[in-house]
Every structure is written in C-alpha cells, then in structure tokens.
Amino acid sequence: MSEQLIAVERRNDGVAVVRLQNGKVNSLSSEVLRQLRSVAESLTTTPPGAVVIVGSDRIFAAGADISEFSGPDEARSIGRLFLEALNAVAAIPRVVIAAVAGPALGGGCELALACDLRVCSTGAKFGQPEILLGIIPGGGGTQRLARLVGPSRAKDLILSGRQVRAEEALRIGLADEVVSPEELESRALELAASFA
C-alpha cells in the first residue's frame, strides 16, 4: 500500500479540506497526482458543500518532482497525470479554494489555477518556471492562466518563467484575496463555509 500523501477531512460545516503532505516542498510526484485525482473524483461523486486545498505552512506546492523526468517518455507520462489530476480538481462540482502559503510554482501554480478561487498569504508567490527547463506548463496552466490574467500577461509569465508575489498576483487577477500567513487557513475555511 502506498503512503498517504494527501489527507482529506470532511468537516461538520460542509467543507472538505484536502491537505497536500509530500515532504518539505510538497512536490507533485506521480503518486501525489494519482492520489489527487482519486480524491477529486471522490469529491465529485459525493460532493461536500465546498473544498479547500492547502499545502504546508511554508509552501503550497513546488510543482513536478523533476527527479521522475528521466526521459521524454516519463515526461509525457507525468504530463498526462498532471492533466488528468488537475482536470479532475477543476471538475469538482462545488467551489474549490486554494489556500496558498509560500511558493506555488510550476505544477503547484497549475493546481492553484485549477481551483475556483485563490486565497494567499502575503508570502505567496506564483510562477510557471517550466520554460527554464525547456518545457511549457503541461497541466492546463497555459489555458487557465490566460483566462485569469489575460493572454498578454499569461505569455509574459509562461515565456519568461517570472514569478509574482502575492500583491502583484492580486492586482493582475491571479489571486482573489491576500491575508497574513496566520489568517490564511481560517480565511479560506470561512470563505468555503459561505459557499457550503
């Protein structure tokens, strides 16, 4: 049996909390993506009132586990897993809120983009640095980012690999709210409960 890298808590207020728990950087390994897809499909089959996805106190998700990219075939396989998992998150028939503390980079940013709303802490930063590895975002990020911030800003972020901090993310429409790190989870839960 594989290690549980994602925990789900269904609260009495109708909110389901999905917690990423894959080590220090919350990398989205192939096993995390499989578990995320399974969790999202379960939340679609038996939906709660709303969903909050959280990482750790210091990092939302660092993106793909690049140690798994041993060649083009593995990269394609992981790309498919990303697309399947993030599409499953986007398909949850309730409001899904990403509570973003610290970096949400690469696939971590794409996970936040697959959510309906993004509440972030003042220390959050978003970015699609895949171009620096010679690849482009493969989990739906090119489309979802453009829908949120417009095609021109999306091209800037995707083609440069530039990262944006919380205040800029709020200004350009990538984040919906910015709160202190201490308030992040409680604010995301409060917002989710208002939809539940």
Map each language-model feature to its residues.
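Conserved CoA-thioester-binding segment of acyl-CoA-metabolizing enzymes
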Residues: 1-54, 87
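Hydrophobic/aromatic residues within transmembrane alpha-helices
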Residues: 18, 53, 65, 111-113, ...
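Glycine- (often His-adjacent) and acidic-residue-rich active-site loop
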Residues: 32-35, 55-88, 104, 132-134
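Glycine-rich beta-to-alpha active-site loop
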Residues: 87-133, 137, 163
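C-terminal long alpha-helix characteristic of the crotonase
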Residues: 119-124, 166, 175-196
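Hydrophobic, secondary-structure "cap" segments at the distal end of domains
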Residues: 143-152
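Short, structured loop/turn "capping" segments at alpha-beta junctions
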Residues: 151-155, 164-171
